[in-house]
């Protein structure tokens, strides 16, 4: 089971590297059991500039904050947007995707996102 999770992690990492062309600042993901946060650059998809109304989190959740030409932010509860919460032994794995749907053409693209929440142990 750990091997499968390791391969999935490598696949996600490879997808992130390929999509962002090595620019690690192109995306940031943070989460807790109460919120999911993603910040992306407008050029995250193949250095093609995307407008905030063309990019979505999960099942169609819109950008929640824009700093023009710098970044777009998504801030949602983990039960929103079709975010999948997968409980594992010591952690919760939150999985979703960033979707790009061009308003001027048929171009579409997706990038998987995941975030790990460490479970708090009661003492």
Swiss-Prot record:
It is found in: Secreted. Keywords: Secreted, Signal. Its main location: secreted. Residues 1-26 form the signal peptide. It comes from the Eukaryota. GO terms for cellular component: extracellular region. The keyword Zinc does not apply. May be involved in cell differentiation. Belongs to the PLAC1 family. This is Putative oocyte-secreted protein 1 homolog. It comes from Homo sapiens.
């Amino acid at each position: 089971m750990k091997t499968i999770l390791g391969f999935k992690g490598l696949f996600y990492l490879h997808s992130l590297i390929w999509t962002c062309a090595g620019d690690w600042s192109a995306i940031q993901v943070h989460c807790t059991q109460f919120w999911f946060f993603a910040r992306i650059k407008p050029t995250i998809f193949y250095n093609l500039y995307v407008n905030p109304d063309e990019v979505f989190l999960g099942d169609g959740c819109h950008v929640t904050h824009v700093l023009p030409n710098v970044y777009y932010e998504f801030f949602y509860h983990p039960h929103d947007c079709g975010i999948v919460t997968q409980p594992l032994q010591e952690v919760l794995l939150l999985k979703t995707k960033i979707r790009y749907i061009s308003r001027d053409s048929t171009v579409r693209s997706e990038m998987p996102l995941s975030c790990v929440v460490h479970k708090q142990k009661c003492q």
